[in-house]
Amino acid sequence: WMKKHPLTDEYSRFGSFDMLAENNREQLKGLIAEIAGQENEKGTVAQKIADIYNLAMDSAKLNTEGIEPIKADLERIASVKDKAEIGPLMAELSHIGIRPYFTFFVDADIMDSKSNLFQLYQGGISLGEKEYYLDTDEATTDIRNKYKEHIVKMFRLAGFDESAARKNMEAVLEIETRIAKASFSAVEQRNPAANYHKMTLDELKKSVPGIDWDAFLSGVGVKGVTELSVSQVEPIKEVEKIINTIPVEKQVAYMQWKLINRAASYLSDEFVAQNFDFYGKTLSGRKENQPRWKR
């Protein structure tokens, strides 16, 4: 396999499923490029596909715009002045793919496959595994230090001065480290029974009263929830403590970081390059970023 499929610089690994994904992407590229290169009737699915593909491929436009595509969202987050506003903002951000603190979804109830269940799941950290925040060996410490500098550089690209960028980085690390300490490890997440805590909405409100769950569910657009599963209770309770005890300005910095981090690969070449330098090279071991059409 290794002789027939030498590892290219854009991959840190390449197995049979990677090959399937690569072949699938090539076929999709051909289909989309054909649609994007022709005139399409306004309002059709083809027109929408062409518009979003051509926009994503227009690096000159993205480089000119810089931080502009997410500037209004950064300002919206910065407008939060009270902890009571954080829950509704979390729900609001979910509509643009940003889920700070924890994630959520609707999926089959693992104890009753005929029913779907709203589920809360741990999240909120940007390094994937809790050990990156907590282990003290040389390799992990080096990654953590590079992550800190990466956060600073990204805030600088977003228009923050050096002092503000470093202050924001400290806030991000404080919050993410607290979430990491309470989170389940990858091994612990493999135990289905330990990651299933079905309860009524009223029970959730009593267990985690520091979050306005009615406002949150209404904000994300979910109605009629009477039962749900809290996959990992401890990190959700830790988030409750964070929201109610950490100064709002630190939480603003954290949520702004989640936005910048999530949007980085869709912004200008400077953001893309810095994002790849850390997540691609440092964290994943890749030597070269993928071409724009793959990203």
Where are these regions (language model features)?
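Zn2+-dependent metallopeptidase catalytic domains
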Residues: 1-295
